[in-house]
Amino acid sequence: MATTSKILFRGAASTSSTLLYTVPASTTTVVTDIVITNTAASSATYELLLNDIVLAKTVTVGANDSTIIQLKQPLTATQTVKGLASAVTVNFHISGVEIA
């Protein structure tokens, strides 16, 4: 089995629920870190779902601040990570390990 450390998603959040990552076929992914940054001068909120189960719901990230979520959450083939935020000034950086 090949194990590959990987950036699963890096980019700006949408204000509606958006698919950020889908586990490829015949693969298990372990999500290890999620960094949420807010580049605005006012606070914003975000939501994250792992396979449609809420991980974080309407969590505030302060103005010009970051939040780090460290976890070891396995996802199997076709499972997803989704997210959204109250403003497009929120960015997600999601990393993990793919095992194929």
Task: Give residue ranges: language-model regions.
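Cysteine-clustered segments with highest specificity for TGF-beta superfamily mature ligands
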Residues: 79-83
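Short solvent-exposed strand-capping/beta-turn motif centered on an Asx-Ser/Thr pair
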Residues: 36-41, 86
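Short, surface-exposed beta-strand/strand-loop-strand elements in extracellular ectodomains
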Residues: 40-59
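C-terminal interaction-tip segments
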Residues: 1-29, 33, 85-100
